[in-house]
Swiss-Prot record:
The keyword Glycosyltransferase does not apply. Pfam families: Proteasome. It is found in: Cytoplasm; Nucleus. PROSITE patterns: PROTEASOME_BETA_1 (PS00854), PROTEASOME_BETA_2 (PS51476). The lineage of its organism: Eukaryota, Metazoa, Chordata, Craniata, Vertebrata. The gene is psmb1-B. Non-catalytic component of the proteasome, a multicatalytic proteinase complex which is characterized by its ability to cleave peptides with Arg, Phe, Tyr, Leu, and Glu adjacent to the leaving group at neutral or slightly basic pH. The proteasome has an ATP-dependent proteolytic activity. This is Proteasome subunit beta type-1-B. Its main location: cytoplasm. GO terms for biological process: proteolysis involved in protein catabolic process. Belongs to the peptidase T1B family. Keywords: Cytoplasm, Nucleus, Proteasome. InterPro entries: Ntn_hydrolases_N, Proteasome_bsu_CS, Proteasome_sua/b, Proteasome_suB-type. One of its GO terms (cellular component) is cytoplasm. The 26S proteasome consists of a 20S proteasome core and two 19S regulatory subunits. The 20S proteasome core is composed of 28 subunits that are arranged in four stacked rings, resulting in a barrel-shaped structure. The two end rings are each formed by seven alpha subunits, and the two central rings are each formed by seven beta subunits. The catalytic chamber with the active sites is on the inside of the barrel.
Length: 237
């Protein structure tokens, strides 16, 4: 029998319109903005990031640096989804503790980069939404920068920018450090003082144009003596 609910007032069947399949979407990722940058010199390396944590037009935190100290000679900068940044850095720190207990020494910057590549590649079907840059000293005491994509491909660079303002910072670094497509220019070694000032200048410029970058700049200066930090205020609007 046909129920009364399926019939109209005149006793005829109601017309039903099929609108097509409905796709229920679930996104496990969010983009929390922020910018990271690393520069390598002859005997030093810099890793810098802003401290703004945002989503869309909302600022969740004004004091959330994206630089994480791994060893006495290695710092990692992470930008992207903040939850994945925290999870990934905790995994790296646990691996470093296991390595130190087993080998009675700290892992080198190059070994950390290789380990991170395997961690990211192992999650390639559900990747961490994180852009990573490692800065530190290599076995010979020279500055080294390693940049990654979200699924583990990496390379060693002299300088690299990542995050929401990377498209603004990378051309400036190409010009001021890499001397790309410049003729009759003397390429002098980059001093630590000039590198720090350059990092401050490019972040101040980026904060003027990128709404996801701002509040403050944290610079980690890595030398054989250890890691020194500097905080520089940026615009807060």
């Amino acid at each position: 029998m046909i129920s009364a609910q399926a019939c109209g007032a005149n006793g005829k069947m109601k017309d039903y319109h099929y609108s097509g399949p409905v796709e229920h979407k679930f996104s496990p990722y969010a983009f929390n903005g922020g910018t990271v940058l690393a520069v390598a010199g002859e005997d030093f390396a810099l890793v810098a990031s802003d401290t703004r944590l945002s989503e869309g037009y909302s600022i969740h935190s004004r004091d959330s640096p994206k630089c994480y100290k791994l060893t006495d000679t290695t710092v990692i900068g992470c930008s992207g989804f903040h939850g994945d940044c925290l999870t990934l850095t905790k995994i790296i720190e646990a691996r470093l503790k296991m390595y130190k207990h087993s080998n009675n020494k700290s892992m080198t910057s190059g070994a950390i980069a290789a380990m991170l590549s395997t961690i990211l590649y192992g999650r390639r079907f559900f990747p961490y939404y994180v852009y990573n840059i490692i800065g530190g000293l290599d076995e010979e005491g020279r500055g080294a920068v390693y940049s990654f994509d979200p699924v583990g491909s990496y390379q060693r660079d002299t300088y690299k920018a990542g995050g929401s303002a990377s498209a603004m910072l990378q051309p400036l670094l190409d010009n001021q450090i890499g001397f790309k497509n410049m003729e009759n220019v003397e390429q002098v070694p980059l001093s630590q003082e000039k590198a720090v000032q350059l990092v401050k200048d490019v972040f101040i410029s980026a904060a003027e144009r990128d709404v996801y970058t701002g509040d403050a700049l944290k610079i980690c200066i890595i030398t054989k003596e250890g890691i020194r930090e500097e905080i520089v205020p940026l615009r807060k609007d």
